[in-house]
């Protein structure tokens, strides 16, 4: 590297440091003093179900006063309690209302009633990366790299705030109108300074240390990034089997096979991310995220331009208008039932 290039790199590293320090200040203000709830169910017109889960659903809604479309996550308090997800749900709201990054979906409103908790987020009409990946089969390496770069920056941001994401997978990545990623579902995100022990995540994406019930840290997100890049570029995940237990055996074995079309740079990066030995896993070493950002596979990536959303996306989802749902699957519709008496008031008093 010439002196000028070295100086430029140095100033970029400094400006990232400054940016993250300021971001932490902004985050902590909102983390310590969460915004009060600022809407009610009657403010929204419900349009269509976009997805369902074990304790709720996500619906497309229209804000009556502004006519803006949003995605409303509706969680049944009693089901959340039954499934022991109180802590996770409170975490999700508290984190979402405090973060601010170009590739994180924004929480616009939150409120609760006798039966449910509601989180109203910006609506991302392009649908899940998952459905586009399954339709196309696999992404070219430049296409996969464009998405991977956004996740790297997002994890760099989250980790600087002591947040572990813990749920990376193509189903949780939405493609926006400009073809960029919006990370959604902070149900497993957690603020952790040291290690944590909770078993959570998706079998194919779990790091070996989670499976082995060891205390784990942010490095689990870098492992999951390796799984995601592999799945984007191959069309299938690196560890798969019919039963979770068989998947876990493959993950802890530390053996990965690569398709012949993977470039040698890609294989090298993945060997360093899908590294069972934590003392060798990229993202977890003394240089932190810079081992990933300066890796040869990312040589062509302009990190600042990605952050500024100035890079042309390899794919723009098709959709007609802001309330179009054609990129989402159809689900059976169900009425939102609200009890006349308050359920689980104590458990969710801080929501």
Swiss-Prot record:
Q: Specify the enzyme's EC class, one word.
A: transferase
Q: In the UniProt record, what gene is named as encoding this protein?
A: PRKACB
Q: Protein name, please?
A: cAMP-dependent protein kinase catalytic subunit beta
Which residue range or ranges hold the AGC-kinase C-terminal domain? 299-351
- Name the Pfam families for this protein: Pkinase
Q: Does the keyword Transmembrane helix apply?
A: no
Found in which tissues? Answer: Isoform 2 is mainly expressed in heart and brain.
Activity control, as annotated, is:
Activated by cAMP.
């Amino acid at each position: 590297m010439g002196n000028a290039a070295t100086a430029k790199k140095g100033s970029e590293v400094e400006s990232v440091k400054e940016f993250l320090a300021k971001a932490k200040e902004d985050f902590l203000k909102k983390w310590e003093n969460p915004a009060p709830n600022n809407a009610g169910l009657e403010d929204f017109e419900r349009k269509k179900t976009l997805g369902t889960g074990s304790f709720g659903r996500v619906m497309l809604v229209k804000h009556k006063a502004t006519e803006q479309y949003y995605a409303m996550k509706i969680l049944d308090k009693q089901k959340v309690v039954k499934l022991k997800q109180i802590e996770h749900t409170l975490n999700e709201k508290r984190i979402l209302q405090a973060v601010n990054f170009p590739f994180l979906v924004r929480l616009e409103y939150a409120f609760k009633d006798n039966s449910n908790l509601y989180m109203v987020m910006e609506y991302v009409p392009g649908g899940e990366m998952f459905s586009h990946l399954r339709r196309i089969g696999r992404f070219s390496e430049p296409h996969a790299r464009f998405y991977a770069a956004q996740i790297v920056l997002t994890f760099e941001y989250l980790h600087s705030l002591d947040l572990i994401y813990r749920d990376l997978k193509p189903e949780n990545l939405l493609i926006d109108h400009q073809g960029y990623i919006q990370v959604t579902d902070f149900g497993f995100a957690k603020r952790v300074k040291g290690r944590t022990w909770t078993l959570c995540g998706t079998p194919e994406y779990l790091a070996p240390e989670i499976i082995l019930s060891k205390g784990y840290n942010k490095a689990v997100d870098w492992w999951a990034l390796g799984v995601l890049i592999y799945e984007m570029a191959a069309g299938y995940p690196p560890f798969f089997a019919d039963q979770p237990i068989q998947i876990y055996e493959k993950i802890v074995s530390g053996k990965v096979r690569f398709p012949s079309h993977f470039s040698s740079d890609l294989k090298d990066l993945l060997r360093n991310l899908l590294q069972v030995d934590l003392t060798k896993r990229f993202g977890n070493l003394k240089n932190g995220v810079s081992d990933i950002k300066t890796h040869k596979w990312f040589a062509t990536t302009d990190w600042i331009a990605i952050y500024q959303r100035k890079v042309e996306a390899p794919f723009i989802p098709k959709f007609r208008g802001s309330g179009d749902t054609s990129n989402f699957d159809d689900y059976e519709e169900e009425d939102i039932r609200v009890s006349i008496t308050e359920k689980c008031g104590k458990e969710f008093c801080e929501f």
